[in-house]
Amino acid sequence: MAETTIGFRCQDFVLVAAAGLNAFYYIKITDTEDKITELDSHKVVACAGENGPRTHFVEYVKCNMALKKMREHGRMISTHATASFMRNTLAGALRSRDGLYPVNCLLAGFDVPASAEDDVATGAHLYYLDYLGTLQEVPYGCHGYGAPFVTAMLDRMWRPNLTAQEGVELMQKCCDEVNKRVVVSNNTFICKAVPKDGVERVQSVS
């Protein structure tokens, strides 16, 4: 999976970026596809993989989360529950006759209490998932050809108390490093933040 996806937690939000590359073998279709899908107002998933399975998987997850929210009378589904559902879907597909979903994902979310009596753990969360059904909550993570370079940068430069400006600057450095190091086109990155007020597009990262 050539496209690079990057995510990390900051002081009170999560930042996620994904390369806009959409290609069929050696043919580039577009450089500006948004691969960060909004599952709801406080959760996004950055998904890399083949076009058909990727689109099918994220739509399947999004629709099931909407159904579960309706069954819960409008109560927001937690990020951990969403990650568990995604992991179960990936692991189940791996063992089915239909075959696996060849996708790698970063799930970012910010859990907010539904009421004063709500005991759900609030705050920013980032989960790493791969096509084999691996699931782990991480402070930062990445997929794709640029992952080794970005991981090295984040090992050295990431801090849990990054401010909004520092987080955006670090994400831009990561994107620039991928563009410099990786031969496969990752010229355009789309970036989104998930703070307590809901998903926002970060225009200053590209």
Swiss-Prot record:
Superkingdom per UniProt: Eukaryota
Keyword Nucleus: yes
Keywords attached to this entry: Cytoplasm, Nucleus, Proteasome
One GO BP annotation of this record: ubiquitin-dependent protein catabolic process
InterPro entries assigned to the protein according to its UniProt record, in alphabetical order: Ntn_hydrolases_N, Proteasome_beta2, Proteasome_sua/b, Proteasome_suB-type
Main localization, broad class: cytoplasm
GO cellular component terms, A-Z: cytoplasm; nucleus; proteasome core complex, beta-subunit complex
Keyword Cytoplasm listed: yes
Compartment(s) where it occurs, according to its Swiss-Prot or TrEMBL record: Cytoplasm; Nucleus
GO molecular function, one term: endopeptidase activity
Membership in a protein family: Belongs to the peptidase T1B family.
Oligomer and partners: The 26S proteasome consists of a 20S proteasome core and two 19S regulatory subunits. The 20S proteasome core is composed of 28 subunits that are arranged in four stacked rings, resulting in a barrel-shaped structure. The two end rings are each formed by seven alpha subunits, and the two central rings are each formed by seven beta subunits. The catalytic chamber with the active sites is on the inside of the barrel.
Family annotation (PANTHER family): METALLOPROTEASE TLDD, PROTEASOME SUBUNIT BETA TYPE-1
Function, as annotated: Non-catalytic component of the proteasome, a multicatalytic proteinase complex which is characterized by its ability to cleave peptides with Arg, Phe, Tyr, Leu, and Glu adjacent to the leaving group at neutral or slightly basic pH. The proteasome has an ATP-dependent proteolytic activity.
Protein name as catalogued: Proteasome subunit beta type-2
Species name: Trypanosoma brucei brucei
